[in-house]
Amino acid sequence: YELFLRKEKIKSALRNAVANGFEGFDVYYQPIMDCDSGHMIGAEALMRFSMYQDKKKEPVSPVEFIPLLEETGLIIPAGRYVLNKAVSMCHEMRQYIPKFKINVNISYIQMVKSDIWKDILSSIKQYDLPPECLCAELTESGYTDMTPYFYKLRKKFEEKNLQFVLDDFGTG
């Protein structure tokens, strides 16, 4: 029962956050380093979420909130928010590191239930960035039973000169 209440509380907080300009969402950036040179060449954008209770900020683990975003469909607007923040940051970083790349996690739900292509292309166009500056990290588990779909997806990425990698490969 406690687990049920916790999930409902988080879902409610997620709905409110999305409705209120993504208040409580943050994007953290994990550097990607070139091992030979020791220089930063990019970053992975990581979605984080904190809910507010009694005016106190309570961080919520991605292990808890990501499945709830997917379950409710809120992963689509939240993912769009992270994508736009990440591409904006990539634009800023390319002033200092000209070949800087940004990796963005894309949920299986985003791929099959939203127009993620339009979102990606619109975002990189808005900041006048080349497609190869963005790498979509697709969680392998969502595609395990979708081999024909996955091949179409790969072809679409290649046609748009977009990179993708399988995230959490081998974890099922």
Model-derived regions, located:
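Catalytic-site/binding-pocket detector for metal-dependent nucleotidyl cyclases
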Residues: G73-L74
